[in-house]
Design a protein with these regions (language model features):
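Beta-strand-loop-alpha "switch" segments that mediate conformational coupling across diverse proteins
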Residues: 200-228, 240
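Walker A/P-loop phosphate-binding motif and the immediately C-terminal alpha-helix
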Residues: 3-45
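G-domain G4 guanine-recognition motif of GTPases
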Residues: 15, 149, 173-188, 210-217
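P-loop/Walker-type NTP enzyme "switch/lid" segment
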Residues: 42-120, 221-226
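Conserved C-terminal guanine-recognition region of P-loop GTPase G domains, centered on the G4
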Residues: 155-170
Length: 264
């Protein structure tokens, strides 16, 4: 793809735990890399970092060093090996070492990530829930992506995320429904959230698609490998690829055509 002047920040969040948000973040990072994007996945779940576990890595780089200013971003990231490689920046898995950072430090991290012009996209894997730092990351990104499930409890939590995002002056997030039995169930779920948001927020999240229930997903988690690498033909991988292409097409610069009369 044509290179952007600055990376596009995509914050991936959920109103609650258990939605499969981190697996979606890891899978989208690889799927977008397959689309030709230079991707950095930043584990912004500062209280319970676990992207490293999903990827089977010994280290996810040195996020603490970047936050403290002791490490340059370029020296602190780790490249995920294999086809469709991307970089990752995380704290040690499950350490909770960065759980107490404030919004000022979160802002400095966003500024650092936005200045990383060697990437086309930075994905922020947010913590579950709607605490102040999580919502700061979500509102600071160019776009947020909300992951919800058909679980009725997920609707209230997803609405809380959307409401707080709008309260911070950001537009409503994109939406995907994970662990759906079928497309009809996913659309009912997204429709219910859309109805609530329209009634109280006067706008509706843009639905990007659903990720079906798929036994390959849990197997990829167990084997600590990205789903698109391990099971490229799985139904969930196909769905992730559709979402990735929709996201990619939203930021890919339009090609410049040269005609006899000049640039158009």
């Amino acid at each position: 793809m044509s290179r952007l002047l600055a990376p596009h920040l995509l914050a991936i969040g959920s109103g609650k735990g258990g939605t499969g948000k981190t697996l979606i973040s890891v899978s989208l990072a690889q799927a977008l890399a397959f689309e030709g994007e230079r991707v950095l996945l930043c584990d912004a779940d500062l209280g319970l970092s676990n992207t490293v576990v999903h990827l089977g890595l010994d280290s996810g780089g040195d996020l603490a060093g970047v936050l403290s200013g002791k490490r340059a971003l370029a020296d602190a990231v780790v490249t995920v090996p294999g086809a469709g490689g991307f970089d990752i920046l995380a704290a040690p898995a499950g350490s909770g070492a960065l759980a107490d950072i404030g919004e000022d430090q979160a802002k400095r991290l966003v500024d650092t990530l936005r200045a990383a012009k060697n990437y086309d996209r930075v994905i922020l894997d947010l913590g579950a829930g709607v605490d102040a730092v999580t919502m700061h990351f979500a509102a600071s990104a160019e776009d947020a992506l909300l992951v919800m499930t058909p679980d009725p409890a997920s609707l209230a939590d997803a609405y809380a995320f959307a409401k707080l995002l709008k309260r911070r002056g950001a537009r409503l997030p994109y939406l995907i429904v994970n662990m759906a039995a079928n497309d009809a169930e996913a659309r009912r779920t997204s429709g219910a959230l859309g109805t609530t948001c329209q009634a109280f927020l006067q706008s509706v999240p843009e639905y990007l698609g659903c990720i079906p229930r798929d036994a390959h997903v849990q197997e990829s988690v167990r084997r600590q490998r990205p789903l698109p690498t391990l099971y490229p033909q799985a139904p969930a991988t196909a769905a992730i690829t559709v979402v990735a292409r929709r996201l990619h097409n939203k930021i890919a610069p339009a090609p410049v055509t040269i005609r006899a009369s000049g640039l158009r």
